[in-house]
Amino acid sequence: GADVAHKQQSVNHLLYLVTSHYPSLDYSLL
C-alpha cells in the first residue's frame, strides 16, 4: 500500500525533474 504509493510518487517526481530539464526529448518512448 503506502510503500508502493511512495515509490510511484518518487518515480513521478523523477520524471518531472527529467522532463523539466530536458523538454526536447521524445518522452513518448517511455
From Swiss-Prot:
One of its GO terms (molecular function) is oxygen carrier activity. It comes from the Eukaryota. Disulfide bonds: none annotated. It is found in: Secreted, Extracellular space. Keywords: Copper, Oxygen transport, Secreted, Transport. Belongs to the tyrosinase family. Hemocyanin subfamily. Hemocyanins are copper-containing oxygen carriers occurring freely dissolved in the hemolymph of many mollusks and arthropods. This is Hemocyanin subunit 2.
